[in-house]
Regions:
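Extracytoplasmic ligand-binding site segments that recognize negatively charged/polar headgroups
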Residues: 67-78, 97-100, 113-248
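A ligand-binding cleft/hinge motif common to bilobed small-molecule-binding domains
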Residues: 124-128, 249-268, 317
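Sec-dependent N-terminal signal peptides of Gram-positive bacterial secreted proteins and lipoproteins
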Residues: 2-23
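A bilobed periplasmic-binding-protein/Venus flytrap-type ligand-binding module shared by bacterial periplasmic
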Residues: 166-173, 209-212, 281-293, 304, ...
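Periplasmic-binding protein-like
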Residues: 148, 163, 223-226, 232-233, ...
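Bacterial lipoprotein signal-peptidase II cleavage site
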Residues: 18-29, 38-40
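Mature extracytoplasmic/periplasmic domains
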Residues: 278, 288-341
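Short, polar/charged alpha-helical segment
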Residues: 48, 53-62, 67-92, 167, ...
Length: 362
């Protein structure tokens, strides 16, 4: 009897356990399905987007310094340097001098180059540097706006500004003057005429080269000036000073920006460009192949063609390099009569012509 009772209890227990199992299985399945649904409906965790690689032509971050050799006017050089540093954070180390002084310094530093960018007041001297293989090719910003012919075909010389030479005269000595180049050899101007030293003044050097290659009687004109008492007081500044003080009445081939600046200060001077034409001399900015700070050098050349730099150029009485920038304080490029220039021919004769003029005046 006891065995029957035990068997009955075991049977009831098994039935009870089976019922529980059937009840829990759907619950487990339901929970599993709910979890699966929640997982599917939950938004996927966002993966941070990968950073796009920098563009290959993106300008590098600038730092450090750039060394620039610049001719006068000194005030312009200082303002350009200050503005560039403010814009980029790059310090500008300068050497300021005449074209002759800059070239001499470059020659002395050949074994240990220092300069990154060189600006000269002589396009022919820039061409000589190019012929010697010293320059880096580059296409600066706003190159499409530059006056025609002010960037060479290999994009190594960039006319960042320009000057023209004219006849500057002291109005207390010579009240009115409009003589052409050859007419300045007239006896009425005997011992009154001076000229900047063409071996120191790049602008005068290029003018004489243009005179002898672009006219039929350039060398004869030089000789006639010498016969009429032409003197060479020094580079541009010294030569202008001789006329400003009245020591001489007339300056042949004086750089125009100096005249306009002095006139604005009230000096008794005037300037004109002879009707037969003069030489407009783009002042080449050049990047040296040996530039220790190449990226900064390119950035500085880009800056020279910017709106800000071109305004500084115009304010200094120089001709801007961009055709869309006009001057209000001097004669504009389109109003200056010009000799037809062949810069390759001028480069070949420039140094010898400058030396000859000096020898004629001794």
């Amino acid at each position: 009897m006891k065995k029957k009772m035990l068997a009955l209890l075991l049977a009831c227990l098994c039935l009870s356990l089976a019922a529980c199992a059937k009840t829990e299985a759907p619950a487990a399945e339901e929970a599993e399905q709910t979890q699966s649904t929640e997982t599917a409906e939950a938004p996927a965790e966002e993966t941070p987007a990968a950073k796009e690689p920098a563009a290959a032509d993106e300008a590098p971050a600038l730092s450090g310094k750039v060394t620039v050799y610049m001719p006068s006017p000194a005030g312009l050089a200082d303002k350009l340097a200050e503005a560039f540093t403010t814009k980029t954070g790059v310090e500008v180390e300068q050497f300021q001098g005449t074209t002759g002084e800059i070239l001499a310094r470059l020659e002395a530093e050949q074994a240990n180059p220092v300069a990154d960018v060189v600006i000269l007041a002589s396009w022919s001297d820039g061409l000589s540097m190019k012929a010697d293989g010293q320059l880096e090719s580059y296409t600066p910003a706003n190159a499409d706006k530059v006056n025609e012919g002010w960037i060479d075909e290999d994009s190594m010389l960039f006319g960042s500004s320009a000057s023209a030479v004219g006849v500057i005269y002291n109005t207390t000595v010579v009240p009115e003057l409009s003589a052409d180049w050859a007419e300045l050899a007239d006896a009425q101007y005997k011992d009154m005429i001076a000229i900047p030293d063409p071996e120191k003044s790049g602008a005068c050097k290029d003018f004489l080269a243009g005179l002898v290659t672009g006219t039929a009687d350039g060398e004869a004109i030089m000789q006639s000036w010498a016969d009429n008492g032409l003197t060479v007081p020094g580079a541009n500044k010294a030569a202008l000073e001789a006329v400003t003080t009245g020591e001489k009445g007339i300056l042949i081939a004086g750089v125009d920006y100096n005249a306009y600046s002095s006139m604005a200060k009230g000096e008794p001077l005037n300037i004109y460009y002879p009707a037969s034409g003069t030489v407009v001399n783009p002042r080449p900015a050049m990047i040296l192949k040996t530039a220790p700070n190449m990226d900064n050098a390119k950035a500085f050349v880009d800056f020279l063609f910017s709106d800000e730099a071109q305004k500084l150029v115009a304010d200094a009485y120089l001709l801007p390099d961009r055709s869309d920038v006009q001057c209000e304080n001097r004669t504009n490029l389109s109003d200056i009569p010009q000799i037809t220039t062949d810069w390759d021919k001028m480069m070949e004769v420039a140094s010898d012509t400058a030396a000859k003029l000096n020898s004629l005046c001794k």
